[in-house]
Amino acid sequence: MTTLDSNNNTGGVITYIGSSGSSPNRTSPESLYSDSSNGSFQSLTQGCPTYFPPSPTGSLTQDPARSFGSIPPSLGDDGSPSSSSSSSSSSSSSFYNGSPPGGLQVALEDGNRVSPSKSTSNITKLNGMVLLCKVCGDVASGFHYGVHACEGCKGFFRRSIQQNIQYKRCLKNENCSIVRINRNRCQQCRFKKCLSVGMSRDAVRFGRIPKREKQRMLAEMQSAMNLANNQLSSQCPLETPPTQHPTPGPMGPSPPPAPAPSPLVGFSQFPQQLTPPRSPSPEPTVEDVISQVARAHREIFTYAHDKLGTSPGNFNANHASGNRPATTPHRWESQGCPPAPNDNIMAAQRHNEALNSLRQASSSYPPPWPPGATHHSCHQPNSNGHRLCPTHVYPAPEGEAPVNSPRQGNSKNVLLACPMNMYPHGRSGRTVQEIWEDFSMSFTPAVREVVEFAKHIPGFRDLSQHDQVTLLKAGTFEVLMVRFASLFNVKDQTVMFLSRTTYSLQELGAMGMGDLLNAMFDFSEKLNSLALTEEELGLFTAVVLVSADRSGMENSASVEQLQETLLRALRALVLKNRPSETSRFTKLLLKLPDLRTLNNMHSEKLLSFRVDAQ
């Protein structure tokens, strides 16, 4: 039984969904993360830590069973927030002396929030697992008219049968997709969906779920868990990196190595990654905050040459000599990556399959690799346990710096080691939902670096572990959006993935991503127009992550204090770099509500794909 979170719509992180959507034959990260299911699923996480993506809303409420997935607050039949949602205002930062810059107060308080104390009472669970409405996919409030349904669909069906309402004929041949965000648009199709899933006046009953039905539902959940277990266990031997010895890094001595960490990490593993709260340290000075955050951003959020364990000169020399990477397995074996002579062929096939699936929308595509580019696929972990995507050497044009290259060197060739999967690992004949999921999955390896960056924010580890996880779950998508804003070419209306493959806005819009991509382009244009330095970008990223108004915080006062410290440092740095542009800091802060809006749009887009895949 697939589970979802009925939390607020104040934002969250990237959620990666299965192609089966909310089919009862498959499980979801949300159900596997609940307290009661952890016991039966413990065998998965012990031998092979798996990536369970974070919740789009990102709030870690008092109920652990609702830690994953997202649904913005339930709406009534008239589109207004239902009784299960309540609005709460975020506290104003004392940094603004009670009056933040224009628009920021509204931006940080936009959207309705679900009070943890109220929302948990209206959620139906089975052994700790949240159940979904059979009609629209919202969180079920109980067993109504024969099926698990939300309050909105229960009331809609009750009015329909009691008043014998004859709804207007559907304009789309009665083929409307009924999801939470559009369930009020076509009432005829909604009533038809109610009947098709089994809602009936004769099915009204009182009391608890019968034992026989409860056992059947538990059996479905267990079979879904076993299926996920089998799939992950078959992948586990291929994903386990070699044990590495600690080596002192630029940020100080490395901690003792963890026993063979998996390249993919889930938010259920955060308590093992994050340090327990320590005694409050003396408040650092503004200069210390700027230097520490900038250094962490530079050394963690970089496409650094040293992450591959080889210098750019040596790498380029190997390619200049005409040696194919596939014919030099000793170079990769020395770094813990087994020789794979067919990696290039398989990688090219997967990439071409993904392109062929997208070419149906348009026939004008750039070549998969730029002329002269050399490619090798080796998903190897670096010294920090990060999973690196294939490396590429791109010749820069004569007299020009490489486009979108995070670092500019003296050499004409630039070594790019990105923390993202460079292309979807798909198959031919995929649906739009599957292609969208593949693109979302391309962000997976970057999540680990967000965790690592957070640990180096001064004062972050002083927070409780609960608040650390809550901030990470809620802010990871926004951090990644800031980080990859440079990949959006506003002038040409294209998106360049880190494989150097460029997709036009029109092509991706044909897949149903138009509104979300337009908002991403607008945000990228605004952010890039500020021309932030590396230090400013690092501090702004920290401010985005440490937001005191996230729902589910245990000690919001401590988070707010840390946020004020980061804001003071960011303001001092911005005014120091450009003292004449006094409004630059305010413009930068006004990007926070834009990020929150993007977060909400991304959450609803993934939710609609999940329900459509039923």
Swiss-Prot record:
<feature type="DNA-binding region" description="Nuclear receptor">
    <location>
        <begin position="130"/>
        <end position="206"/>
    </location>
</feature>
<feature type="compositionally biased region" description="Polar residues">
    <location>
        <begin position="1"/>
        <end position="48"/>
    </location>
</feature>
<keyword id="KW-0804">Transcription</keyword>
<feature type="binding site">
    <location>
        <position position="418"/>
    </location>
    <ligand>
        <name>heme</name>
    </ligand>
</feature>
<dbReference type="GO" id="GO:0043197">
    <property type="term" value="C:dendritic spine"/>
</dbReference>
<dbReference type="InterPro" id="IPR000536">
    <property type="entry name" value="Nucl_hrmn_rcpt_lig-bd"/>
</dbReference>
<dbReference type="GO" id="GO:0044321">
    <property type="term" value="P:response to leptin"/>
</dbReference>
<keyword id="KW-0007">Acetylation</keyword>
<dbReference type="GO" id="GO:0045893">
    <property type="term" value="P:positive regulation of DNA-templated transcription"/>
</dbReference>
<dbReference type="GO" id="GO:0005978">
    <property type="term" value="P:glycogen biosynthetic process"/>
</dbReference>
<dbReference type="GO" id="GO:0001678">
    <property type="term" value="P:intracellular glucose homeostasis"/>
</dbReference>
<dbReference type="GO" id="GO:0060086">
    <property type="term" value="P:circadian temperature homeostasis"/>
</dbReference>
<comment type="subunit">
    <text>Binds DNA as a monomer or a homodimer. Interacts with C1D, NR2E3, SP1 and ZNHIT1. Interacts with OPHN1 (via C-terminus). Interacts with PER2; the interaction associates PER2 to BMAL1 promoter region. Interacts with CRY1. Interacts with CCAR2. Interacts with SIAH2. Interacts with FBXW7 and CDK1. Interacts with HUWE1. Interacts with NR0B2. Interacts with NFIL3. Interacts (via domain NR LBD) with HSP90AA1 and HSP90AB1.</text>
</comment>
<dbReference type="GO" id="GO:0050728">
    <property type="term" value="P:negative regulation of inflammatory response"/>
</dbReference>
<dbReference type="GO" id="GO:0070859">
    <property type="term" value="P:positive regulation of bile acid biosynthetic process"/>
</dbReference>
<dbReference type="GO" id="GO:0010498">
    <property type="term" value="P:proteasomal protein catabolic process"/>
</dbReference>
<feature type="modified residue" description="N6-acetyllysine; by KAT5">
    <location>
        <position position="192"/>
    </location>
</feature>
<keyword id="KW-0805">Transcription regulation</keyword>
<dbReference type="InterPro" id="IPR050234">
    <property type="entry name" value="Nuclear_hormone_rcpt_NR1"/>
</dbReference>
<keyword id="KW-0010">Activator</keyword>
<dbReference type="GO" id="GO:0042749">
    <property type="term" value="P:regulation of circadian sleep/wake cycle"/>
</dbReference>
<dbReference type="GO" id="GO:0005634">
    <property type="term" value="C:nucleus"/>
</dbReference>
<dbReference type="GO" id="GO:0001222">
    <property type="term" value="F:transcription corepressor binding"/>
</dbReference>
<dbReference type="GO" id="GO:0004879">
    <property type="term" value="F:nuclear receptor activity"/>
</dbReference>
<keyword id="KW-0966">Cell projection</keyword>
<feature type="compositionally biased region" description="Low complexity">
    <location>
        <begin position="69"/>
        <end position="103"/>
    </location>
</feature>
<feature type="region of interest" description="Disordered">
    <location>
        <begin position="233"/>
        <end position="286"/>
    </location>
</feature>
<dbReference type="GO" id="GO:0030425">
    <property type="term" value="C:dendrite"/>
</dbReference>
<keyword id="KW-0770">Synapse</keyword>
<feature type="zinc finger region" description="NR C4-type">
    <location>
        <begin position="170"/>
        <end position="194"/>
    </location>
</feature>
<keyword id="KW-0678">Repressor</keyword>
<dbReference type="InterPro" id="IPR001628">
    <property type="entry name" value="Znf_hrmn_rcpt"/>
</dbReference>
<dbReference type="GO" id="GO:0031648">
    <property type="term" value="P:protein destabilization"/>
</dbReference>
<keyword id="KW-0238">DNA-binding</keyword>
<keyword id="KW-0479">Metal-binding</keyword>
<dbReference type="GO" id="GO:0061178">
    <property type="term" value="P:regulation of insulin secretion involved in cellular response to glucose stimulus"/>
</dbReference>
<dbReference type="GO" id="GO:0032922">
    <property type="term" value="P:circadian regulation of gene expression"/>
</dbReference>
<keyword id="KW-0597">Phosphoprotein</keyword>
<dbReference type="Pfam" id="PF00105">
    <property type="entry name" value="zf-C4"/>
</dbReference>
<protein>
    <recommendedName>
        <fullName>Nuclear receptor subfamily 1 group D member 1</fullName>
    </recommendedName>
</protein>
<keyword id="KW-0862">Zinc</keyword>
<dbReference type="InterPro" id="IPR013088">
    <property type="entry name" value="Znf_NHR/GATA"/>
</dbReference>
